[in-house]
Amino acid sequence: MHAVVLVGGFGTRLRPLTYAIPKPLLPVAHVPMIRRLVNRLAEGGVTDVVLALGFKPEPFFAEFPNNMCGDVRMTYAVESTPLDTAGAIGFAARAAGITGTFIVANGDVMTDLNVADLVAFHRRSGARATISLTPVDDPSQFGIVETDADGRVLRFVEKPQPGETESRFASAGTYVMEESTLALMPGTEKLSIERVTFPQLVAEGGLFAMATNDYWIDAGRPDTYVQANRDIATQLRDPADAAVHVDAVVASSAVVRDAVVSAQVSIGENAQVSNSVLLNGAFIGNGAVVEQSIVMGSVGSDARIVDCIVGPTGIVQPGHVSTGGRFPEGEIS
């Protein structure tokens, strides 16, 4: 079975990290997001993946130099201009020569969804397309999906106000689609699957949804990226995948709590790191405090950062204090 994986976004919420590294290639517990996603798809029966690319395609080619991810064959569809979700799906599916039933997945979603179960539900229902749903605590922050007892989608409610809907289920970013849906997604112009294609399918009664309680997180924001790293690191059993990588250099007097630390990281004496992700290249000076942050650059001695992102060329000067800062501030040329 084929899958289209949407990875063409700019990753604006994770800048300045994503000026250098496309968001789906950022590691989650030491493994690039895209590899974790493709491995999950493979467990559900996917044999071929086409990446719908736009921004910075070259790093993806480098990540898969033999065009394989495990046993999954990788191909690429590079947009010359952004096509939005449905446009990208139509373009990539045609580029890969997809026929029959196929999967669509968002490249920045981490989930334990059993894709084979979603496909089985899709086939039982006779749907043209099926979307996975996940329960959310605050429906006002999501596009909420209402279904009937059989799972047929009745309507979408975008960021509902209190009392506007009883549903608490949001689209989880994984879809099963029939080849016939490509007629609604020509792939030649910008087109939104959420605002155009799905409503068309709802109108004809051909869109279904399956809700699960599987682990799910959109790792595309700073807070959720940190949370995804922590969540997945705690699920792993291999010492090489421990939250603090065995090859990281951590001073004996440093304190590291609820953080994920990559291999090529140095943490100095009396430094404190909590609720953060330190990526390859990060340097934390003596006495520095790092909280709720993502660091790939340098944090000087006795500096204190909270809710910050330090890119690969970012430098937090010794003694500097920052909340919500981005280092460097401007675009990296």
Where are the language model's segments positioned?
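N-terminal glycine-rich phosphate-binding loop and ensuing alpha1 helix
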Residues: 1-61, 312
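Histidine-centered beta-alpha loop that forms part of the nucleotide-sugar donor binding/catalytic region
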Residues: 8, 54, 107, 134-135, ...
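A structural signal for short hydrophobic beta-strand segments in well-ordered beta-sheet cores
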Residues: 25, 145-147, 198, 209
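Short internal beta-strands
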Residues: 50-54, 132-133, 294
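Conserved beta-loop-beta/alpha segment of the NTase-like Rossmann-fold superfamily
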Residues: 60-149
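Catalytic-core segments of class I nucleotidyltransferases/pyrophosphorylases
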Residues: 102-103, 110, 116-123, 136-139, ...
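Structural signal for interior beta-strand "rungs" in well-ordered beta-sheet cores
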Residues: 242-333
